[in-house]
Every structure is written in structure tokens, then in C-alpha cells.
Amino acid sequence: MSKKSITIITAFIILAALSRLLPHATNFTPIGAIALFGAAYFSDKKWALIVPLSALWISDLLLNNIMYSSLYDGFAWLSSGFIYTYGAFAMVVVLGYYLLKKVTAGRVLGGAIGASVLFYLICNFGVWVSSPMYPITAEGLISCYVAAIPFFHYTLAGNII
């Protein structure tokens, strides 16, 4: 892969991540698409993971310390549920790396749906296990997933578009 291609792909991923700073519906961001794109177009697995995760972290730094600074005591390097968000994101990169070895419309659509489902399941599990909002029971987990359903279609749309 040429240096020019790497630069273009990296710039595209960073711009997509920074789009999270624009006003949007909750979860209507290209987070899964960024991971899938990186996985599909970086031939080196290391960069397919590092560049999208770094772009996510940079946009999180800006969001947490500018837009949501009132929610934190001091400078926030990471959000409280980062392990679940970044873990889901990393799993989407792995999904994309294997699913998008050959890029076709069907595989991209399948990847976008798979990315959305992975993100939904992992991140909402994180909400359930790490916050006092839900009891740590099967009913609490189900309640958490049900409460998150209204946000799922925005995640899916953000990944597809």
C-alpha cells in the first residue's frame, strides 16, 4: 500500500470521527463504518486497528472535554464505559477485516448490520454491568437492552450511510 493511499485513508477516517462533533441524533455517527472502512482498506492489520481507534479516542477527547465537560471532574482522558465502547469498536474492526477481504455491496451491508449489532450488544452490556441504572439480574440485562432499542436504528443508519 502506498504512502499516499495510507494518508488518504487515514484522513478519511479522522474526518468521519470528527463528524461526531457535529449536531446529530443520538448514536447517528459513522462509528461502525469507520472501523469497517479501516479494516477493509488497511492491508496491515495493525493500522486497521490503530487508526480507527485513535480517531475515536481523539473525537472522544474533544467531546468529553468540550461538549460534555460539565459531566467530568477535570480533564477526561477516557469516558467511564470506554472499555466496552473501544472493545466493541475493535471487534468491529476484526469483523470487517475478515468479512471485507473482498468489498461488495452485500458484504458492506452485512458488515454495517453486524457492526451495529455488536456495538449494541457490547456497549449496552457495559451499561448494565457498570452502572446502577439496572439490577445485575437477567431482568436487568433485558431491561437495559430494551431501553436501548430506540437508539439502535440510529446506530444502524449511521453505519450504513
Which residue stretches match the model-derived regions?
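Membrane-embedded alpha-helical segments of multi-pass membrane proteins
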Residues: 10, 25-42, 62, 82-91, ...
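Central hydrophobic cores of alpha-helical transmembrane segments
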Residues: 12, 48-59, 108-116
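Helix-boundary and loop/linker segments of multi-pass membrane transporters
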Residues: 1-5, 25-26, 70-71, 101-104, ...
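Membrane-embedded alpha-helical hairpins and interfacial helices in multi-pass inner-membrane proteins
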Residues: 98, 102-161
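Juxtamembrane membrane-interface segments at transmembrane alpha-helix termini
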Residues: 41-50, 61-69, 121-124
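Hydrophobic transmembrane alpha-helices
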Residues: 1-42, 46-51
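Alpha-helical transmembrane segments of multi-pass membrane proteins
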Residues: 16, 40, 56, 60, ...
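Interfacial aromatic-anchored transmembrane helix boundaries in multi-pass membrane proteins
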Residues: 19-27, 54-94
